């Protein structure tokens, strides 16, 4: 079971990854091996875990710990879980966590281009994408 840490100080630097870093800082364009991504719901966290990503911190509503997120916690090893009531988390992040759970993961190494294209029938090359979540929207 991970270590559960009650949030008592919103300025704690350990919470920066969830509240004070920009997308560009999380991606760490100049040092991609240090890049981070945030999974923003139990379903997305489960997918990341299934793909082999390892979380280094979680942010979670207190009521989720013994409820819907119990299965996620069992898979997260020693990653610290920062927790508080919904209102405190909204104050920290600037928005209400709709599913009550966030997880911070280190970005995995990218596979070689040859491996990605090996069985592909089509390949799209997109340059200068700032926010990949908008692709296809």
Segment roles from a protein language model:
Residues 1-68:
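Boundary-proximal intrinsically disordered activation/regulatory segments immediately upstream
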Residues 2-5, 43, 50, 87, ...:
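RNA substrate-binding interface of SAM-dependent RNA methyltransferases
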Residues 14-18, 45, 89, 98, ...:
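A general structural signal for well-ordered alpha-helical segments in protein cores
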Residues 29-31, 94-96, 115-119:
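Solvent-exposed alpha-helices and their adjacent loops that cap or buttress functional pockets
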Residues 54, 78-79, 99, 119-122:
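Short coil/turn connectors at secondary-structure junctions
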Residues 64-66, 87-90, 98, 108-111:
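A short acidic, glycine/proline-enriched capping/turn motif at secondary-structure boundaries
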Residues 73-94:
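A glycine-rich helix N-cap at a beta->alpha junction
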Residues 103:
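Glycine-rich phosphate-binding loops that contact phosphosugars or nucleotide phosphates
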């Amino acid at each position: 079971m991970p270590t559960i840490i009650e949030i008592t100080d919103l300025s704690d630097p350990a919470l920066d990854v969830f509240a004070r870093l920009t997308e560009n800082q999380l991606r760490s364009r100049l040092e991609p091996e240090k890049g981070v991504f945030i999974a923003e719901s139990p379903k997305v966290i489960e997918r990341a875990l299934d793909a082999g990503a390892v979380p280094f911190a979680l942010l979670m509503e207190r009521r989720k710990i013994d409820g819907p997120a119990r299965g996620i916690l069992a898979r997260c090893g020693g990653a610290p879980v920062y927790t508080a009531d919904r209102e405190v988390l909204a104050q920290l992040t600037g928005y209400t966590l709709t599913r009550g759970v966030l997880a911070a993961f280190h970005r995995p190494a990218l596979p070689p281009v040859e491996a990605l294209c090996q069985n592909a029938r089509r390949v799209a090359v997109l340059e200068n994408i700032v926010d990949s979540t908008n692709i296809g929207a």
